[in-house]
Amino acid sequence: MGGLAATAALPAFAEGTDCASSASAPVCRREELQSELIAKWNDGTEAVSPQVYGQYLRDGDTRGFWALDALERAFEKVMREAKETTVAGDVPAVWSVYNMGYIVKTRESLFSIDLVHRRDAEFASLLDFALITHNHGDHWRHGFYGAMDGAHKTVVSNFKDNYGVKNRKQDGGYVRGVKTFRIKDVEIRTSLIDHNDYLIDFTAAFEIKTGDFIIYHTGDSGRGTEPKLGTAWGRPDLWLFFPGCGVNTAKAVEKVNAKRIVFGHLWELGHPQGHRGRLDKRDLRPRLAAAKTAGCENVSVAFWGDRII
């Protein structure tokens, strides 16, 4: 099915907000509008198979697919707004780029978490450092890592050596686990959680503190890892959460007790529709409901390009 023909009824990328996201203000949406957009984005991404997405990554041709055009515009929007935005207090500016990828700006720093995009290396010159939760291709790309490493910028992960943030054991393995450090005005605490039943302690969760504001990013979290979730520095102001890979949403929400939750990993195009690594409409709606039932009233999704705070 052709890209444009399949998505002709969808709204323009800039539409669909009650208050437009910009360099000076985050997006906000009524719950009813969010529900409508979930359905429309689900239809718009359905036409893009993993094979088509792979071709786009290789040659940059969107082939008229609405979702791929949206992905290009999202990147340009976030880069433009990140350059234009000034942060004065402890509360950072946070943008959703794609999947579990976010850009965060504080008073002194600009950094990424799990940034993945065809053009992600273009951000390297702007960033002070980057965080990567785990060694899967939908959470990091070699070109981006190479650009950061080549520019002598810190990349924090649990699988790459970079400027002393992570040390090697004498036997050649990696020191993995809880580590706390500071980069400019950002304090970071790492811990390990399970990606799924067999990738135990595979994901590095990041507790990120700027002043008194706490962001918690848990990458991919799987079934049974709920007891490992949680922050040491206080209740998270914002939890960037993927309720897939088998994690029990209600148990996780009760354990973390975040003030606000934003779901990520939406419509990850490298996975086929229906795969648990791709949060589609079928699974998204009940998990939004489960998070609210578990006690978090402020739970939402971030579409590509949204400024969250």
Where in this protein do the model-derived segments appear?
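Active-site-proximal loop/helix segments of hydrolase catalytic cores
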Residues: 116-119, 194-257
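Binuclear metal-ion centers of metallo-dependent hydrolases, dominated by the metallo-beta-lactamase
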Residues: 169-187, 200, 230, 254-309
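Active-site environment of divalent metal-dependent phosphoester hydrolases
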Residues: 119-120, 136-140, 161-164, 179-181, ...
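Divalent metal-coordination and catalytic microenvironments
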Residues: 104, 134, 188, 220, ...
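N-terminal export leaders
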Residues: 1-6
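Portal/gating segments that form or line small-molecule/metal binding sites
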Residues: 145, 149-160, 166-193, 204-207, ...
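Hydrophobic/aromatic beta-strand patches that form the interior of the parallel beta-sheet core
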Residues: 131, 156, 189, 240, ...
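Metallo-beta-lactamase
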Residues: 7-97, 103-123, 127-129, 140-159, ...
